[in-house]
């Protein structure tokens, strides 16, 4: 059940990100058609790129939050009544009892969520996609033919 919720949330985050990116592109095109000033056109392009980056960052944060919640639920961390906290800085917080807190920036606090904090970067948890086709938790002794370091010692060549 939790896996289905995570998948649905990830799909929704991707869809929202795609819509936000499309909206930013269309707004840029409309702004460029309104003006002849190259500075205004460049500003429209920069605004579009900022909105696209923000949409992508929100999608990644949602996916990371979902993955952290899945890991916390599977690990049985004992933080309250089946709840766990997750911080985007990687620090584990205190259990919140029956009040689930969100790791999304500004969510439930009244703060603006459409601003990017300079100097921050998105990181992947250990064992997640590193872009190399393998996770950081790859075991070199498992899988794929050749000498893996394990075997029966038999001579079967089937």
UniProtKB/Swiss-Prot annotation:
Composition bias, Gly residues: 142-158
MF terms (GO), sorted A to Z: copper ion binding; nickel cation binding; osmosensor activity; zinc ion binding
One GO location term (cellular component): cytosol
Feature: compositional bias, Low complexity: 82-91
Pfam families recorded: LEA_1
Keywords attached to this entry: Stress response
Protein's job: Involved dehydration tolerance. Involved in the adaptive response of vascular plants to withstand water deficit. May possess chaperone-like activity under water deficit.
UniProt protein name: Late embryogenesis abundant protein 46
Organism, as annotated: Arabidopsis thaliana
Name of the encoding gene: LEA46
């Amino acid at each position: 059940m939790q896996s289905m919720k995570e998948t649905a949330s990830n799909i929704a985050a991707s869809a929202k990100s795609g819509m936000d990116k499309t909206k930013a592109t269309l707004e840029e095109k409309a702004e460029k058609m309104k003006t002849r000033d190259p500075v205004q056109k460049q500003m429209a392009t920069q605004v579009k790129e900022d909105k696209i980056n923000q949409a992508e960052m929100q999608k990644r944060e949602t996916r990371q939050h979902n993955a952290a919640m899945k890991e916390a639920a599977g690990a049985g961390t004992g933080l309250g009544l089946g709840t766990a906290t997750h911080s985007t800085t990687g620090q584990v917080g205190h259990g919140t009892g029956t009040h689930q807190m969100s790791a999304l920036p500004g969510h439930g606090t009244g703060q603006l969520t459409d601003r990017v904090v300079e100097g921050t970067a998105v990181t992947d948890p250990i064992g997640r996609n590193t872009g190399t086709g393998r996770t950081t938790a790859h075991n070199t002794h498992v899988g794929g033919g050749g000498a893996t370091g394990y075997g029966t010692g038999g001579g079967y060549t089937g």
